[in-house]
């Protein structure tokens, strides 16, 4: 499996977002809130919902999205059969490694849930 984040690994359609929001499991961390839903296809999928209410500046929203995409991309082999929507939580700025570890912890918690 390649480590590219191709189009089929992303949640793109509004219907898919609504389904995950309606039927997904929710887990909150210090920096993230993750909604997840088990799916039949072997590839994991990622959707992002980073609100202006949480991060007012575009630079902060973009940093948050980059961290979420990179964490998902590098660990996608461990996340098979799941769809995720990642949202940012209100928090103070943190280092990338701390935010990455928090998101990884939430992914692992959902998979073993």
Curated annotation (Swiss-Prot):
The keyword tRNA processing applies. GO terms for biological process: tRNA 5'-leader removal. RNaseP catalyzes the removal of the 5'-leader sequence from pre-tRNA to produce the mature 5'-terminus. It can also cleave other RNA substrates such as 4.5S RNA. The protein component plays an auxiliary but essential role in vivo by binding to the 5'-leader sequence and broadening the substrate specificity of the ribozyme. NCBIfam families: rnpA. Belongs to the RnpA family. InterPro entries: Ribosomal_Su5_D2-typ_SF, Ribsml_uS5_D2-typ_fold_subgr, RNase_P. It comes from Vesicomyosocius okutanii subsp. Calyptogena okutanii (strain HA). PANTHER family: RIBONUCLEASE P PROTEIN COMPONENT (PTHR33992:SF1). Its EC number is 3.1.26.5. Keywords: Endonuclease, Hydrolase, Nuclease, RNA-binding, tRNA processing. GO terms for molecular function: 3'-tRNA processing endoribonuclease activity; ribonuclease P activity; tRNA binding. Consists of a catalytic RNA component (M1 or rnpB) and a protein subunit. One of its GO terms (cellular component) is ribonuclease P complex. SUPFAM superfamilies: Ribosomal protein S5 domain 2-like. It catalyses: Endonucleolytic cleavage of RNA, removing 5'-extranucleotides from tRNA precursor. This is Ribonuclease P protein component.
């Amino acid at each position: 499996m390649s480590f590219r984040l191709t189009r089929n690994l992303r949640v793109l359609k509004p219907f898919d977002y609504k389904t995950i929001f309606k039927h997904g499991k929710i887990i909150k961390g210090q920096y993230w809130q993750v909604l997840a839903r088990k799916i039949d296809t072997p590839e994991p999928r990622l959707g992002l919902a980073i609100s202006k209410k949480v991060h007012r500046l575009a630079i902060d929203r973009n940093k948050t999205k980059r961290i979420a995409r990179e964490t998902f991309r590098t660990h996608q082999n461990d996340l098979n059969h799941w769809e995720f929507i990642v949202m940012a939580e209100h928090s103070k700025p943190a280092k990338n490694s701390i935010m990455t570890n928090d998101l990884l912890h939430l992914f692992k918690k959902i998979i073993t849930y």
